Amino acid sequence: MRNWQAPTRRAALFLALLAVTGSALHAEDAMNSTSSHFAYIGTYNPNGEGVYRVRVDPASGALSQVTLVSKVPNPAQLTLGVGGKTLYVASEVADFNGGKHGGITAYRINPADGALTQLNQVDSQGAGPVYLTSMPDGRHLLVANYVSGSVAVFPIEADGSLGAASSVQQQQGPAGAAKPAAAVNGSFAVSDHNGPHAHMIASDPSGKFVFSTDLGLDRIYQWRFDAASGRLTPNDPPWIAASSAGAGPRHFVFHPDGDTVLLVNEEASTLTSYRFDRQKGTLKQLHAVSALPADYQGTSFASGLALSKNGDTLYVANRLHNSIAQFSVGAGGELKPVAETWTRGDYPRSLALSPDGRYLYALNQRSDNVTRFSVNPTDGKLSFVGGYLPIGSPSQMAFLPPPK
């Protein structure tokens, strides 16, 4: 062992500076751990290896510290349970755990670091689950299986795990038109009008009624929901036709006014607004507009929706056109185009607004990145802030509630 010697003045000064710097860095890390929060990103295999946890800086919206937290197969879709204590992940496959369906995995979330603890796994009751969401009271999980065209309901147990399916409905009917009638000139957007393909399922804010879209049948199904039994029963009428032949209804969102539903049609690249009857639980079409610029010609597939908290601004992602189209939402569900923004990536599969609405993220599946935009608080217009997060085939993003 070398004999210890007193440090020189320069060395002592360096050690003191190092101690101060280290303390500052430690303080900054501590501040970041309390002021930042987490989000989860689902991906497609093979570029994406599973579910990733990222740290979100609430001031800048920057994403960092990408960590693989789950390696379940093809976890393209995910959702938080009510309260943000659990995460549910859909494996978009047809052979989950050696079976013939997809699967849903339930996780408990550690709020301190966003780590996941698996609770259980269930068969999704169909092939290729592409959407899942909790009922407003947090007691049931709704799942849409795209490949098989079925929808299912699962009870959520007290610990957040999933029980056996309480209701399974197989959507049936003649396939929709192969070519969308409302598509722009030069569009070759034709896909999957060969049978039922459930693309989304969600309830109204009251939890009394449920709607599911079927891209293959060009229908929007209307269900009544019994909270005691967790069962779906057809409403009257049980479904309504899409706004145009071959439109391919994909995703929808309820407006904060509680009376309006905004829906995106994938194949036609159009948006449709509906009046929601709160008493009957049915929809009536109001308006329909193109999600693409008036002068665009060619193929594009509309995908994800994001609605501002106040309901004034709707954003829709256009794949192949690789844009985010912005619309104002007026009285009576009227939609007017405001602006379009390049996604800075390829094939935006979904959009996500930060919890405070200050940032919007585009999940670009084919360019393997997530891009970040600031949202103008006055007019909702987007500005690219130079943020690229490299991640393989990102599909969907869910934010943990910010720390209180």
Predicted regions, residues:
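Blade-level signature of beta-propeller repeat domains, shared across WD40, Kelch, NHL, RCC1
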Residues: Q365-T371, S383-K404
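Beta-rich, blade/repeat-based domains predominating
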Residues: S33-T34, V72-G83, Q125-H140, Q172-G207, ...
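Short glycine/acidic-enriched loop and turn motifs that connect beta-strands
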Residues: N45-G48, E92-G98, V147-S150, L217-R219, ...
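Blade-loop segments of beta-propeller domains
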Residues: Q65-S134
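A short beta-strand motif characteristic of beta-propeller blades
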Residues: S64-S70, T117-V122, N185-S191, D236-A242, ...
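An edge-strand/N-cap motif at the start of beta-rich repeat modules
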Residues: M31-V56
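Short loop/turn segments immediately following beta-strands, especially the blade-tip
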Residues: V54-G61, Y107-G114, V153-A164, W223-L232, ...
